[in-house]
Amino acid sequence: MLKLENLSVEVAGKRILEDVNLEIPKGEVHVLFGPNGSGKTSLIMAILGFSSYRIVSGKIWFNEIDITRMPINERVKLGIGVAFQTPPVIRGVKLGDIIRIFIGNGTNAGQRQRELTKTLNIPSEFLSRDLNLGFSGGELKRSEILQVLAQKPGFIMLDEPDSGVDVENLELVGKILDNFLKGRSGLLITHLGYILRYVDADKAHVLLDKTIGCSGKTTEILSHILKEGYKWCEKCPTLRKRRYERRISQQL
C-alpha cells in the first residue's frame, strides 16, 4: 500500500533522511521507533508532501501510484490521513465545522458526529471551540483522533499519539485506535511505545542516523529498546552495513 524507495529528504539544505526504504502492505499497521530528533516526524511530513521537506532522491508509492511530486490535497484524496503530534492552532475555525466538513451532509451525518464524540468522551460544547486553541494534551489528542475518525482514511499516520497524554486518555485513545485500525493500514510513530499496550502492530522499524536501521517483530524490538535504549540499535548489523556503504560512497 505504501512503499518508500531509497528516499532522501532535505530541509533548508540539510539532509535529514537518507536512503529510507519502507513497505507497508495493505491491511498492516507498522510502528516506527526512534530517539528524539531522529527524523520520525520529518518522514511523515515528506510522505504527506509538505514543500519544505524536499525530496532529493527516491520514490514514494501509494497503492502503486507514484505520489513523490503529488500535491498534499491529492494525496489526501487518495486516502492518506494523519494525526499530528503538535497540530497548529487555527483561530476562527471551530472544531465542529471541521468535523462536519469531513463527515459531509448525508442523512446520517448528525448521528455519526454524535457517535464519534460520545466514543471519545467529547462534550458537545467542545465542538464550538476554536481548533486547538487552549486545548490540553488530552484534548489535543482526542481532537486529532476525532478528525481522523471522521475522515475514515484508508491509510493513517499517527505521530506520537502517546506523548503528553495521561494514563486515562492514553487507554481511551489507544483502544479506539486499535479498533479503528482493524482492516486498515497505518504507520504509528512512537518514542517509548506506551501506545502499544493497546494497539497491535504487525511489524516494527527503528529510524536511526537518518535511515531505517533495523526491522522486525514489534514485541522483540520494543523489548530491546525498553531494556537497553537505542544503544541496542547501534549494534544492528544492518545499520553498521549501511553506515559503511555510506562512507564508501562519500569517498568515491
State each model region's role.
Residues 33-38:
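The feature captures the beta-strand-to-loop junction immediately N-terminal to the Walker
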Residues 160-161:
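Walker B catalytic motif
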Residues 2-4, 17-19:
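Conserved structural motif at the start of ABC-family nucleotide-binding domains
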Residues 211-234:
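Conserved beta-strand-loop-alpha-helix hinge in the C-terminal portion
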